[in-house]
Amino acid sequence: IHTMGRDDSRSDLYRYPYEPTPYCVLERMANTGMIRKGNTLLDYGCGKGRVDFFLSAQTRCQSIGVEYDDRIYAKAMENKKAAASGARTEFVLESAENFPVPVEVDRVYFFNPFSLEILRKAMARLLESYYENPREIQLFFYYPSDAYISYLMTVPELEFLDEIDCMDPVSYTHLRAHET
């Protein structure tokens, strides 16, 4: 599958460029045990499907990727044909704010894919799904903006649980050595 490369050809003030999550970060997520075989992961701004394919393969979860850009969505669908975890992965061509969240979704991934305005609308859809079928839903944010964090802290249904250390151990050791 081909998921590399940044694509900002259709980005604007509301929808940010496609940039794949590094595999080392996905490995750390998979190794936390927070995503398992019985889970359904929703990946907002899925791009070419890296998060969906990797986590479906590593954790055996079901995965739904939502992408608004038809060109990038087409690349995800091409990748699905070649991916070993393609049968556990579904892609939907839709904007996040209009996507009705399926009641089985219990894990959600965001790599800062869109503006705060769109995040608010996506969260409203997510909460609608939660109230339709109450369940524990875990949200994962990779590089959340300060605006995201400020907003999320005002949503009464949310509770901060933990951070996953995604720093590269080699870089971290190097940084620590220079701090003394």
Please name every model-derived segment.
Residues I1-R36:
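S-adenosyl-L-methionine
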Residues G38-G45:
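Conserved class I S-adenosyl-L-methionine
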Residues G49-F53:
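Glycine-rich SAM-binding Motif I of class I
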Residues S63-E67:
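Conserved SAM-binding motif I beta-strand of class I
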Residues A76-M77:
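Conserved SAM-binding loop
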Residues G86-E94:
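Conserved SAM-binding strand-loop segment of SAM-dependent methyltransferases
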